[in-house]
C-alpha cells in the first residue's frame, strides 16, 4: 500500500533496529557554528539524542595559554581535539574572586596617618604640609604676608608679690624653683633630642614641628659657628613629660624634608 510506504520511522526506532549500542557523537562546523550531536540514556533507560550548538569566536589570548591548549592529551581524552570534550570534561561557570581586607587594620593605619596630618601645617600658606616644602617659600607671597601682632596678655592675678629682695634668675620661674636638686635650674626629664635634621632647618621650622603636640618652654637648634647651618640635631623642652612622650611616639621615624627623624629622650648632662 502506498500510504504505508510514506510513513517514516523515528530516529530512535532506527537506532534500536541498527544495534543495541549508542552511535558515536558527531560534530559539524559551518557558518561560524559548531553543532555537536551525541546519544545517551536518560534516567528512564531510554535512548535520547542531545544536540548542542556552539558559536565559534576568536579571541586573542597570551602565548602561554595558546601553547597550553595544544598539549598532548592522555587517558580517555588521548584522541580528542584541542579544547574540552563534553564527554570527559565538565566546564563550570566562571567564579570571580573578591579579596576582602581587614577593616580594623586599615582603620588603625588611617588613624595614625590622620594624627600626623594634624601636626603638619605650613606657616606661610597654612596648608597641610611642612614650611620647607611650601611652593610659596621664598616668593613674594611669603614676603608680603604680614605677621599678626600678638595681643598683650593681662597680668595674672596669681602673680607673686614683689618683696624687694633679690631673686636669682634660676629661682624666678615657679617651675624652675621646684627643681632645687638641679644645680643648673632646669628639668631635663621633659626634654627630647631630635636628630637627622636637614641643614636648611630653622628655629621657625622646629617650632612648627612641635607646637601642635604640646606647649614647650625652651628649644635649642644646634648650628655651625662658621656656616650657620644646622648641625642635624635639636633639643626641645616640653612643659609636661606626657607631651614629650607623645612627641617621641609621633615624630620618631617620621619623614621630614626627605629625611627620617630620630627622636629620643635627652640624656642629662653631668654637672661640671
From Swiss-Prot:
A Pfam family it matches: eIF3g
Domain RRM: 190-268
Biological process terms in GO annotation: formation of cytoplasmic translation initiation complex
Keyword Protein biosynthesis in record: yes
Domain of life: Eukaryota
Record-level GO cellular component terms: eukaryotic 43S preinitiation complex; eukaryotic 48S preinitiation complex; eukaryotic translation initiation factor 3 complex
Family statement: Belongs to the eIF-3 subunit G family.
Role this protein plays: RNA-binding component of the eukaryotic translation initiation factor 3 (eIF-3) complex, which is involved in protein synthesis of a specialized repertoire of mRNAs and, together with other initiation factors, stimulates binding of mRNA and methionyl-tRNAi to the 40S ribosome. The eIF-3 complex specifically targets and initiates translation of a subset of mRNAs involved in cell proliferation. This subunit can bind 18S rRNA.
Name of the protein this chain belongs to: Eukaryotic translation initiation factor 3 subunit G
Organism in which the protein naturally occurs: Culex quinquefasciatus
Source organism phylogeny: Eukaryota, Metazoa, Ecdysozoa, Arthropoda, Hexapoda
Gene label: eIF3-S4
Amino acid at each position: 500500500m502506498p500510504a504505508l510506504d510514506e510513513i517514516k520511522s523515528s530516529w530512535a526506532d532506527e537506532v534500536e533496529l541498527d544495534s543495541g549500542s549508542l552511535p558515536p557523537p558527531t560534530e559539524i562546523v559551518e557558518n561560524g557554528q559548531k553543532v555537536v550531536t551525541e546519544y545517551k540514556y536518560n534516567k528512564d533507560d531510554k535512548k535520547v539524542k542531545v544536540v548542542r550548538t556552539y558559536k565559534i569566536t576568536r579571541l586573542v589570548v597570551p602565548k602561554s595559554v595558546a601553547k597550553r591548549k595544544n598539549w598532548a592529551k592522555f587517558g580517555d581524552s588521548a584522541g580528542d581535539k584541542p579544547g574540552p570534550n563534553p564527554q570527559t570534561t565538565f566546564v563550570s561557570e566562571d567564579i570571580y574572586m573578591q579579596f576582602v581586607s581587614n577593616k580594623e587594620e586599615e582603620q588603625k593605619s588611617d588613624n595614625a596617618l590622620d594624627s600626623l596630618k594634624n601636626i603638619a601645617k605650613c606657616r606661610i600658606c597654612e596648608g597641610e604640609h611642612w614650611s620647607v616644602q611650601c611652593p610659596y617659600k621664598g616668593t613674594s607671597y611669603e614676603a608680603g604676608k604680614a605677621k599678626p601682632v600678638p595681643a598683650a596678655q593681662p597680668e595674672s592675678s596669681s602673680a607673686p608679690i614683689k618683696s624687694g629682695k633679690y631673686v636669682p634668675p634660676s629661682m624666678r620661674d615657679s617651675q624652675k624653683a621646684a627643681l632645687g636638686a638641679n644645680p643648673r635650674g632646669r628639668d631635663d626629664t621633659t626634654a627630647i633630642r631630635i636628630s637627622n635634621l636637614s641643614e636648611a632647618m630653622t628655629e621657625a621650622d622646629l617650632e612648627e614641628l612641635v607646637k601642635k603636640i604640646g606647649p614647650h618652654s625652651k628649644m635649642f637648634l644646634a648650628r655651625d659657628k662658621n656656616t650657620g647651618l644646622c648641625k642635624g640635631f635639636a633639643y626641645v623642652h616640653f612643659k609636661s613629660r606626657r607631651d614629650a612622650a607623645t612627641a617621641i611616639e609621633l615624630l620618631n621615624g617620621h619623614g621630614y624634608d626627605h629625611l627620617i627623624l630620630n627622636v629620643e629622650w635627652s640624656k642629662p648632662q653631668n654637672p661640671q
